[in-house]
Design a protein with these regions (language model features):
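Short, acidic, Ser/Thr-enriched surface-loop or helix-capping motifs
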Residues: 80-82, 186-187
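Structural micro-motif
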Residues: 154, 173-184
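Short, small/polar residue-rich loop motifs at catalytic or cofactor-binding pockets
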Residues: 72, 97, 178-180
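Thiol-/selenol-based redox modules, centered on thioredoxin-like
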Residues: 180-221
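N-terminal targeting signals for export/organelle localization
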Residues: 2-79
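Short, basic/aromatic recognition patches
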Residues: 167-173
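Structural microenvironment flanking redox-active thiols in thiol-disulfide oxidoreductases
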Residues: 112-151, 156, 163-165
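Short active-site neighborhood of thiol/selenol oxidoreductases, capturing the structured segment around
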Residues: 87-118, 130
Length: 221
């Protein structure tokens, strides 16, 4: 299957993923973004070869080396919005607690809400830690999204080149060429202290739990 075909399939699937969870409207934050009533995932899938996540009940196979709580971050190169490369362990928040939010595509409503929530509802954590979003969107698309959404407190990193991040962490969905939906909290020593991979792609991760874990790491430090 060619790369172009995979990207087309991925775009079609991503649109479906985004629309599936967004039937009922929620309230507005006053920032211009209207939150929707999207299910928050209960529990976590497991990463890596042989594991699956669901899309509307249908399994999609994960690819790559599994990551789990207690593992150290594996160094991979990602592309920043200025097209420069950076290692995932060498971002501007190096030496700090970080929340890494992983989304299939920012051009879908579920991913959009996940990213707004990370940016707007982190309870002041953005002043103390680094917030990161990783997706296979191009750096140009990520930059456009951040500007249009007026999100300046999140570091956007693109895995578009060869899904190196997805494969290194067992979060790569090879068929549609996207990443599974996940959130991880990483301590100052690059150890994963919290990881949730949503079992159903149309559900949001529990960012409130991620915020709680991040705050506890700051307090303990």
């Amino acid at each position: 299957m060619g790369t172009g075909y995979r990207m087309i399939v991925g775009a079609i699937l991503c649109m479906a993923l985004g629309l599936a969870g967004c039937a009922s409207m929620g309230g507005s934050t006053g920032t211009g973004f209207s939150y929707k009533n999207i299910t928050v995932a209960d529990g976590s899938a497991m990463a890596g070869d042989g594991r699956t996540v669901l899309y509307q009940g249908n399994p999609l196979g994960l690819s790559g080396t599994a990551i789990k709580t207690g593992d150290r971050l594996r160094e991979v190169q990602l592309t920043q919005t200025d097209l420069s490369l950076v290692g995932i362990t060498e971002t501007k928040g190096k030496g700090k607690v970080r929340i890494i939010s992983v989304v299939p595509s920012l051009d879908t409503p579920v991913c959009e809400q996940q990213t707004h929530y990370l940016s707007e509802k982190n309870k002041g954590l953005d002043k103390m830690i680094e917030l990161v979003t990783v997706s296979v969107d191009t750096p140009f698309a990520q930059k456009r999204f951040s500007q249009e959404a007026k999100i300046a407190n999140v570091t956007f990193l693109s895995d578009y080149r060869d899904a190196e991040f997805g494969k290194a962490y067992g979060l790569y969905l090879k068929g549609p060429h996207i990443l599974a939906r996940a959130v991880m909290v990483v301590d100052a020593n690059n150890t994963v202290r919290y990881l949730q991979i949503t079992p159903e792609l149309t559900h949001l991760p529990d960012l409130e739990e991620a915020f709680t874990v991040a705050k506890s790491l700051i307090t303990a430090g």
